[in-house]
């Protein structure tokens, strides 16, 4: 078979159309390097001559006119050729992906148009740019210390126990169902959290989305994603073994630990947080594209996106690599500063992965701010991916490397989740009066306290001591703060780092009357 190419022009962007004689015809967009691999490794020839005016600036943020350029092409190919293309990109370019699937020529041309500078500026104008101020140390640091590599490792094991998670197999379906149940169990008791599957009409596997609804700034959304599917490029059948432990059970497991830790601490964000496990990444970013398209069509104000694709293999000298192409430079700087603030011992590198190397590209194409921190420099990542050997054992049967990414991602989600343009609700004040005899105690609460200062104070007669505690009623020997002077004028404060219950105890050291005032930030 040979391609008979023709050029399709739209808004000054190059598109190549090729015709073959077997297999279903589909449209993909791809960069220069991937196009060269397509020309080389498929039994066809695509002769492309890309004029400078038809080349697109590599989208490193929103101000990249002076940087290098890369041609992006729209090509119609046999679907059977995608595995050959994906394998060639992995084998010879030492990276994943490299192309985006499009359901039609019109959709593909629209994607190319959105990659133009003018379209990106227009799209970004409708999206809120966060402040990127780092000021949530009191909330973030305690949670970082609670995160466990063993939890991440177990999720990697559970996901990779499927024969495969390919987007068209029963294993891919089962993995989606399992993850939905896992996240639902973690979220039990939280009415502000929903877990759902996103159905894709053209294939079997569903994406999974967990949502923590924001409090007073819920219309702004932060997304943390990874891809759920796996692939064995030598065998995509029901029985083809594709454990995908690093690619990308590790990313999904990392964001699951972020979700678990937030829920365990009762964290309630101001912005809405979404945790996404995308279907069908390995075949052209299909799942994330459908989701990003639906959010863009609905006008959803997604203020930040982070992609975790492969986190558990340390193949390079640095710990985390920020990929600078087809990502947002301002958000990349913010993530780098987060690592320096919360994980100062880690070494940070930068690299590029080319067009459409993972799901962040789907969001970038819609004008959203996206970042892609990665486990290694390009070409030094896990050598076992896309084979039956991408196992937990081949990353040392540990998840210490993934824990670094999970901690970074939690800092990202809390710092952005706690921020926003809407002014928060004022402190709540509750007052109580009464009297106590000598040695008599009386407890108050629970007070549904949000992040901030919880303060209790008393005035009155006699000598009444004051105690306060988070999560349980205090006693005279178990408390977070106390004030036990020689009068009934006492004050006690607690720094609340996550939403939860708080309680107050009064004890009559000597008989007296009291007036108790409790002030706190409501959840």
Over which residues does each language-model region extend?
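N-terminal hydrophobic or amphipathic helices/low-complexity stretches enriched
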Residues: 113-169
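Second-shell loop/turn segments in exported
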Residues: 138-147, 160-171, 196-198, 236-248, ...
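Active-site-adjacent substrate-binding region
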Residues: 317-424
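Surface-exposed beta-strand/loop patches in noncatalytic accessory domains
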Residues: 425-443, 459-498, 509, 515-523
């Amino acid at each position: 078979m040979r391609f008979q190419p023709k050029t399709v022009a739209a808004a000054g962007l190059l598109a190549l159309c090729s015709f073959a004689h077997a297999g279903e015809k589909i449209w993909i967009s791809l960069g220069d390097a991937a196009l060269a691999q397509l020309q080389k490794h498929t039994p066809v020839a695509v002769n492309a001559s890309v004029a400078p005016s038809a080349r697109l600036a590599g989208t490193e943020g929103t101000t990249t006119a002076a940087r290098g350029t890369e041609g992006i092409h729209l090509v119609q190919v046999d679907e059977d050729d995608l595995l050959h293309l994906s394998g060639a990109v992995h084998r010879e370019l030492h990276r994943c992906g490299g192309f985006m699937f499009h359901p039609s020529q019109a959709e593909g041309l629209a994607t190319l148009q959105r990659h133009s500078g003018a379209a990106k500026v227009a799209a970004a104008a409708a999206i809120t740019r966060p402040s990127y101020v780092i000021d949530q140390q009191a909330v973030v640091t305690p949670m970082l210390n609670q995160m466990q590599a063993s939890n991440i490792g177990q999720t990697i094991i559970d996901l990779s126990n499927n024969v495969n998670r390919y987007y068209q197999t029963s294993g891919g379906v089962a993995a989606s169902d399992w993850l939905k149940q896992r996240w639902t169990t973690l979220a039990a008791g939280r009415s502000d959290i929903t877990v759902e599957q996103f159905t894709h009409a053209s294939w079997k596997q569903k994406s999974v989305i967990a949502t923590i609804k924001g409090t007073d700034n819920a219309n702004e959304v932060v997304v943390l994603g990874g891809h759920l599917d796996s692939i064995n490029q030598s065998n995509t059948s029901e029985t083809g073994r594709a454990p995908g432990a690093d690619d990308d059970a590790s990313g999904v497991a990392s964001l699951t630990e972020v979700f678990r830790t937030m829920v365990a601490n009762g964290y309630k964000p101001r912005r809405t947080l979404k945790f996404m496990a995308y279907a069908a990444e390995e075949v052209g970013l299909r799942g994330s594209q459908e989701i990003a398209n639906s959010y863009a069509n609905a006008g959803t104000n997604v203020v930040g996106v982070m992609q975790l694709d492969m986190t558990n293999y340390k193949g390079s000298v640095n710990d985390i690599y920020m990929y600078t192409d087809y990502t947002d430079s301002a958000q990349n700087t913010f993530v780098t500063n987060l690592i320096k603030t919360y994980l100062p011992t880690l070494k940070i590198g930068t690299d590029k992965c080319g067009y459409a190397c993972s799901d962040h590209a789907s969001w970038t194409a819609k004008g959203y701010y996206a970042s892609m921190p990665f486990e290694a420099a390009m070409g030094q990542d896990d050598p076992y991916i896309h084979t039956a050997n991408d196992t937990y054992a081949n990353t040392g049967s540990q998840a210490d490397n993934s824990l670094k990414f999970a901690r970074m991602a939690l800092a990202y989600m809390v710092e952005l989740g706690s921020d926003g343009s809407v002014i928060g609700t004022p402190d709540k004040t509750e007052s109580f009066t009464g009297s106590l005899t000598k040695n008599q105690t009386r407890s108050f609460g629970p007070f549904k306290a949000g992040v901030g200062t919880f303060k209790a104070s008393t005035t009155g007669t006699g000598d009444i001591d004051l105690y306060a505690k988070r999560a349980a009623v205090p006693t005279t020997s178990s408390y977070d703060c106390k004030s036990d002077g020689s009068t009934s004028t006492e004050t006690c404060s607690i720094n609340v780092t996550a939403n939860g219950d708080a309680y107050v105890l009064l004890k009559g050291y000597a008989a007296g009357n009291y007036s108790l005032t409790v002030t706190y930030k409501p959840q």
